[in-house]
Amino acid sequence: EYDHVATPAEAYQSEADLEKEFIRLLQEQGYEYLPIHTETDLISNLKAQLEKLNHYHFTDNEWEQFFNTCIANKNDDIVAKTAKIQEDYIQVLKRDTGESQNIYLIDKTNIHNNFVQVINQYVEERGAHDTKYDVSILVTGLPLVHVELKRRGVQLKEAFNQINRYQRDSFWAGCGLYEYVQVFVISNGTNTKYYSNTTRSNHLKEQELGGRNKSKKTSNSFEFSSFWADSNNKVITDLLDFTKTFFSKHTLLNILTRYCVFTSEKMLMVMRPYQIAATERIIQRINVANNYKLYGSIKGGGYIWHTTGSGKTLTSFKTAQLASRLPYIDKVLFVVDRKDLDYQTMKEYNRFEEGAANGQALIHI
């Protein structure tokens, strides 16, 4: 549970002041601030961070080859780059000696091996228009989270629309490193929301199709961005409180490495806070049951309640996926009490991960 932190006196706060305060809070939480404003410096830092994570020093030739083929491949779009973070985060480097070397883009096993940095006012001059981005979070040197701020009193949707303009005009520019962004955060100080990169990119695809069904809300529209909340589902809206919770390094790294689902339809889903809380509590109960040998007892079980349409299946899928990776778990059973739920669940599981559900393995009890 999170206790609200009182905000400063209600004096006028410019967007620049809000940005400065946000970065200060991130630094207090252990983020390293870097005065990076150009692509050259961004690439140089990326090389240094990957070398640090992988305990490996690239030769100039190796780095050029790895960067151009694995990181900034001109044939890769947002979907391909998302896959590299969510699924194919171990890339193979062909060393000058002819040997192969595994290079991690992100460490998903020991999340605090990842170096977290913050930059602001990054300049992109090679897009359709000259652009300055507000604040970006670098994880092992790659911009994986981007934050767009507006001063208090400005509608939050303006920040959402501005990110859409960036995607259209400049995220692809240069080496396209900003197409690695997985999660976007928008805030006007008073209200703060987050959403995945495919929410934004698919919104643009709809615009390109001529804006048919403009009144229809889809998963690509502003309405599908999410508020953050604590474990009791108390919504956290103010940027100050949001930063202390969502942007705590442990939480942010967990969201990026554990609580995203890259579906078979190539959509990136970022779980909602109550889904994350439910999943964590189930995994915690499983660990407790194992440590204290509570198998088969009431204390070794639990009950999670979600309302209709709130994403129960995604919660169960992610829980089953994470539980199956525990070293002492051999099998995860999923029990449904109606045939229509069985079909519906299999369909959803296969959407979250192709081949995750197999009807031939069903058992009638």
Task: Describe the predicted segments one by one.
Residues 334:
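Conserved, well-structured core segments
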Residues 337:
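Short beta->alpha hinge that forms the Motif I/post-I loop of the SAM-binding pocket
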Residues 1-331, 340-356:
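ATP-dependent helicase/translocase motor core
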Residues 363-365:
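Conserved small/polar residues in nucleotide/adenosyl-binding loops
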